[in-house]
Structures are given as structure tokens and as C-alpha cells.
Curated annotation (Swiss-Prot):
<feature type="binding site">
    <location>
        <position position="15"/>
    </location>
    <ligand>
        <name>[4Fe-4S] cluster</name>
    </ligand>
</feature>
<keyword id="KW-0963">Cytoplasm</keyword>
<keyword id="KW-0479">Metal-binding</keyword>
<dbReference type="InterPro" id="IPR016100">
    <property type="entry name" value="Prismane_a-bundle"/>
</dbReference>
<dbReference type="GO" id="GO:0050418">
    <property type="term" value="F:hydroxylamine reductase activity"/>
</dbReference>
<feature type="binding site">
    <location>
        <position position="307"/>
    </location>
    <ligand>
        <name>hybrid [4Fe-2O-2S] cluster</name>
    </ligand>
</feature>
<comment type="similarity">
    <text>Belongs to the HCP family.</text>
</comment>
<keyword id="KW-0408">Iron</keyword>
<dbReference type="GO" id="GO:0005737">
    <property type="term" value="C:cytoplasm"/>
</dbReference>
<dbReference type="GO" id="GO:0004601">
    <property type="term" value="F:peroxidase activity"/>
</dbReference>
<feature type="binding site" description="via persulfide group">
    <location>
        <position position="401"/>
    </location>
    <ligand>
        <name>hybrid [4Fe-2O-2S] cluster</name>
    </ligand>
</feature>
<dbReference type="InterPro" id="IPR011254">
    <property type="entry name" value="Prismane-like_sf"/>
</dbReference>
<dbReference type="InterPro" id="IPR010048">
    <property type="entry name" value="Hydroxylam_reduct"/>
</dbReference>
<keyword id="KW-0560">Oxidoreductase</keyword>
<dbReference type="InterPro" id="IPR016099">
    <property type="entry name" value="Prismane-like_a/b-sand"/>
</dbReference>
<feature type="binding site">
    <location>
        <position position="21"/>
    </location>
    <ligand>
        <name>[4Fe-4S] cluster</name>
    </ligand>
</feature>
<feature type="binding site">
    <location>
        <position position="454"/>
    </location>
    <ligand>
        <name>hybrid [4Fe-2O-2S] cluster</name>
    </ligand>
</feature>
Length: 548
């Protein structure tokens, strides 16, 4: 195996024996093969699209396959083998539709086929499937930066499609991007595709924002309970709001309460979910605390997307763990996909929850969130007045991911060290590093404004662009906004590329720069966008307050 897609990759170089995430070598190899098959699908899909037809079935498969390979999603090798077989069938179907639109010699990813599990496992171990097959580290870096950004785009696109919102331009780009990694392109062309991935990430996040808000209303300022009730419960983690909706509806009147965990916390901000009295609040912290949080919750647990981490030997919740969608785990029960026009059947997890003890209380009180673009723009006059009066000197965007590395205490310390005339704008699970601190407010405006899930980083971009307009500025970088971003997985890569496409410069990225950036590619990003690693808390806070 060779995997360097997440921030915690071994020695910030790459995992070669077992993933730091816990991913076994065989699982990593099968995920590589699934991407390899997707490249073959994309070759035919791109040609078909150029001829005037976009194959949505193939596009849907590519989105879900890319999503499957995001860190902390897929753990079951048998499921991955089935996905590979399904991908080969999809590829054959697209190939038949493309017909003479594809000609000439084709790469192995467009022709290799097998239905035999042993042969599939052997292929997953072959050199041609490895990332490291490309000897030129700069080409490899640009290809992987593109693919990893596409994984984030695919995840957001899949969520939007579940709610009935789709754009063929996004699907077409994913095929173009994957197909491009099988071609000999110039460095300039590859950089162009990486920037197009940023543009597509903006489009995907905008589409998902439209899907979520049209379906569930605009997030609003909300005090979220972090204590517990007296009934048994279901803890729902991940990002899928459709699953949240159906679970709340099916648990109503059953005596089973529902709590969010991790990135599902922002579900508490949506008006549509507030009518459910058995929706109690949020339990626990960010994803990497789940071994402890899931244990003390006592009830049933539903993983709708990443992040699911391996169960430890002393954990007892495996028989209470349920997965759904693209998530899977060996030995865990799985809730199947919804039938066309229907809902998922959550009765197995509801019945399991009824047999469980109520959650153990681990904290009490409330946290405040719901500051997506619609809510913040409703407060625009108040915010603008605070900036003009000097009450707010600077905004610091601290969106992104949380993770296990001790060095991530930097983000807590920055939040604590920032002057009291600064406001933190956040989205994603990075918020858990500071959203329970008592940082106060500025004239009634909380000093931590949580927009929501990682995809709601789109809201932070909308807010910045609106402030640019209000203050009559020509450049988004002239705003009193600094960016101190925490990254972990591939959705954060998509968000980073989106910010770069929007012209944002001077982003601090930590706790380490990505291992998949070669020195040359990292140099390009530094020269063109002034991306920089994090430094010491004192130095970075001083620099940000000076607009550097």
C-alpha cells in the first residue's frame, strides 16, 4: 500500500504497511483499485459527454465510489470487492454507449476485467494500480491533488443528489479530471485542472447549500443542548441530513431519543428538525473521540458518512453500531439504501436502541451555532457597524477538520490568544477545538460564529464576498479576514481548492502541510497564493492581527 491522502499520514510522507487511520493494507489496495476502475469509467464517460450525452448512472457511481475512498468511510473488504465488480459493469455499459467515440489504444484501467475475487485482490496488489507508479513526483503530486479534491467534490455532490439536486457540469468535470490522470499533460494543463477542481468545489458546495436550505430551511441561531435525557437514544454521526430527517420521523413516538455527534451537530440549526421533541441535542465531541463517546452513549449508533474509526479491543458497542450509505464496517449491521420514492428502513436500529440504557451524562449546558450565510447576512448591518466602529478589528476563519495530533492544540490556543475584538468564523469539526470555550461576544455578536458542516465553508465564502461588496473593496484579500485552516481529509482539500479559486491568499494550513504536495507543487502554491504552514501561536496571532 501507499496512502498519503490524510493529514496524519506516517511521518508526513505516506503509510506503507498500515494506515495511521487504522486502514489495513488490503483495504487500502482495494480502494486504489476502485479509483483505478473509476478512471476507466471516466475515459468512456468523457468521450460520451463530448459526443453530447452525459451518463448519470456512471456519474452517480463515480461519486459514490470516490466518496467510499475518503478517509474513515469504508472498512469492509467484501463490500469494496462488490463495488469494484459493480464499477466494471458500469464501465462496460458506458463503453457500449460510447461506441466509436472512443478509439485508439486504451490504458489498462479501461480494459482490465475480472469477476473473480482472488483475481481482483491480485490486481489490487499490482504495480499499475499504485500511486507510486508515476516516477515524476511533481506529476504524481498534481494528479493526486486533483483526485483528492475530486473526492471532496464527489461527497458534496452525492449529498445534493440524495436531496434531488444535480448539475451535469459537476459530473462532467469529475469524469474529465479522472480521465486526465491517464494522460500525459503539461504541468500548466494539470494546474489548470486543479484550479477547475476548485471552481467545481464552489459549485458543488453551492448546490448542496441550495439543497439543504430548500429542503430543511436556513440554519438559524440555536442554543444546542449538550446534556442528556432519560430515554434510550440513537446517536447519529456523519453528514447526511436526509438520513437525519427519516430517522427523526421514524423514531417519533417510540420512546427513543435522537442525538447528533461530530459533524451532524449542525442538524440542530435547521428549522425543519426543531419540531421533534425527542431530538435532544448533541453528544460528545469530534470524530476521533468516538471510541469513548460511543461507549458512554450506551445506545445505538448510526454512521451516515465519515468519520468511522476502528473499534478498540475494550470497546463494547459493535453490536450497537449501524452503518448506512457509503459507510461500512466488518460485523456492523448495515441499513440498506432507500427504494425509489421511499425511505430507508431504520426499524432495526430503533429496535436495538429500545433495549439500551439511556446515555451517560458527560457534560451539561449549551453551545451556540447556526451562523450560516443567510443568518449572518440578516445581521449584516450590526456586523458592518461593529467593523466600522472598531468594535470588530478582524475576522479569523478557522474552518476545517479536527484530528488526533497533539499539535492541534494550536487551534485552541489561537482561539484563546486572539484579542477580544476578533471574531472566529468556523465550519466543520475544527470547531470542537474552541466551541465550548467561553470567548464571550462583541455587542451581542458571539466571538465564535459556527456556519455548520465542512461544506458550509461555502457560507464563509459568501459572507466574505458580501462584506467585500458592502465595503466597496476590489479584492477579497483587502478584507480584515485571516485564514487559519485545520485540515484532515479530502473534503478539506476541496474546500482549500475552492478558496484558492475564489482568490483567497495568505492561508495558514495546519497542523502540517499535505504530504501529497511535492516541494515543487508546494512552491507553486506558496508563490501564487502565499499558502503557509502554521507557526507558533504568538507569532501567528501577531501576524494575523497585522494583516499578514
Amino acid at each position: 500500500m501507499f496512502c498519503f491522502q490524510c493529514q496524519e499520514t506516517a511521518k508526513n510522507q505516506g503509510c506503507t504497511v498500515k494506515g495511521v487511520c487504522g486502514k489495513p493494507e488490503e483495504t487500502a489496495d482495494l480502494q486504489d483499485l476502485l479509483i483505478y476502475v473509476c478512471k476507466g469509467i471516466a475515459i468512456y464517460g468523457e468521450a460520451l459527454n463530448a459526443a453530447g450525452t452525459l451518463d448519470r448512472e456512471a456519474a452517480h457511481f463515480i461519486c459514490r465510489a470516490l466518496f467510499t475512498t475518503i478517509t474513515n468511510v469504508a472498512w469492509d473488504d467484501d463490500v469494496l470487492v462488490d463495488r469494484i465488480k459493480e464499477g466494471l459493469a458500469v464501465r462496460d455499459a458506458v463503453k457500449a454507449k460510447a461506441g466509436e467515440a472512443v478509439s485508439g489504444s486504451l490504458p489498462d484501467c479501461a480494459t482490465w476485467a475480472s469477476e473473480d475475487k482472488a483475481a481482483i485482490m491480485a490486481k489490487a496488489l499490482s504495480d499499475e494500480v499504485r500511486i507510486t507508479t508515476m516516477a515524476n513526483e511533481d506529476v504524481r503530486s498534481l494528479r493526486e491533488l486533483l483526485i483528492l479534491g475530486c473526492k471532496g467534490v464527489a461527497a458534496y455532490t452525492d449529498h445534493a443528489a440524495i436531496l434531488g439536486y444535480e448539475k451535469d457540469d459537476i459530473y462532467a468535470f469529475l469524469m474529465e479530471a479522472l480521465a486526465s490522470t491517464t494522460k500525459e499533460l503539461s504541468v500548466d494543463d494539470m494546474i489548470g485542472l486543479v484550479m477547475k477542481a476548485g471552481e467545481t468545489a464552489v459549485a458543488a458546495m453551492a448546490l448542496l447549500d441550495e439543497a439543504n436550505t430548500a429542503t430543511y430551511g436556513h440554519p438559524e441561531i440555536t442554543e444546542v443542548n449538550i446534556g442528556v435525557g432519560k430515554n434510550p437514544g440513537i446517536l447519529i454521526s456523519g453528514h447526511d441530513l436526509k438520513d437525519m430527517e427519516e430517522l427523526l420521523r421514524q423514531t417519533e413516538g417510540t420512546g427513543v431519543d435522537v442525538y447528533t455527534h461530530g459533524e451532524m451537530l449542525p442538524a440542530n440549526y435547521y428549522p425543519a428538525f426543531k419540531k421533534y421533541s425527542h431530538f435532544i441535542g448533541n453528544y460528545g465531541g469530534s470524530w476521533w473521540h468516538q471510541n469513548k463517546d460511543f461507549e458512554s452513549f450506551n445506545g445505538a449508533i448510526l454512521l451516515t458518512t465519515n468519520c468511522l474509526i476502528p473499534i478498540k479491543g475494550d470497546n463494547t458497542y459493535k453490536d450497537r453500531l449501524f452503518t448506512t450509505g457509503v459507510v461500512n464496517y466488518p460485523g456492523a449491521a448495515h441499513i440498506g439504501d432507500r427504494p425509489d420514492g421511499g425511505a430507508k428502513d431504520f426499524s432495526p436500529i430503533i429496535e436495538r436502541a429500545k433495549t439500551c440504557a439511556p446515555p451517560t451524562e458527560i457534560e451539561t449546558g449549551t453551545i451556540v451555532g447556526g451562523f450560516a450565510h443567510h443568518q449572518v447576512l440578516a445581521l449584516a448591518d450590526k456586523v458592518v457597524d461593529a467593523v466600522k466602529s472598531g468594535a470588530i478589528k478582524r475576522f479569523v476563519v478557522m474552518a476545517g477538520c479536527d484530528g488526533r495530533m497533539k499539535s492541534r492544540s494550536y487551534f485552541t490556543e489561537v482561539a484563546e490568544a486572539l484579542p477580544k475584538d476578533t471574531v472566529i468564523l468556523t465550519a466543520g469539526c475544527a470547531k470542537y477545538r474552541y466551541n465550548k470555550l467561553n470567548l464571550g461576544d462583541i455587542g451581542g455578536i458571539p466571538r465564535v460564529l459556527d456556519a455548520g458542516q465542512c461544506n458550509d465553508s461555502y457560507s464563509l465564502a459568501v459572507i466574505a464576498l458580501k462584506l467585500k461588496e458592502v465595503f466597496g473593496l476590489a479584492d477579497i484579500n483587502d478584507l480584515p479576514i485571516s485564514y487559519d485552516i485545520a485540515w484532515y481529509e479530502q473534503k478539506a482539500v476541496a474546500v482549500l481548492l475552492a478558496l484558492l479559486f475564489l482568490g483567497v491568499k495568505g492561508i495558514r494550513l495546519g497542523p502540517t502541510l499535505p504530504a501529497f504536495l511535492s516541494p515543487t507543487v508546494a512552491g507553486v502554491l506558496v508563490d501564487k497564493f502565499d499558502i503557509k504552514p502554521i507557526g507558533t501561536v504568538a507569532d501567528d496571532v501577531a501576524a494575523m492581527m497585522a494583516g499578514k
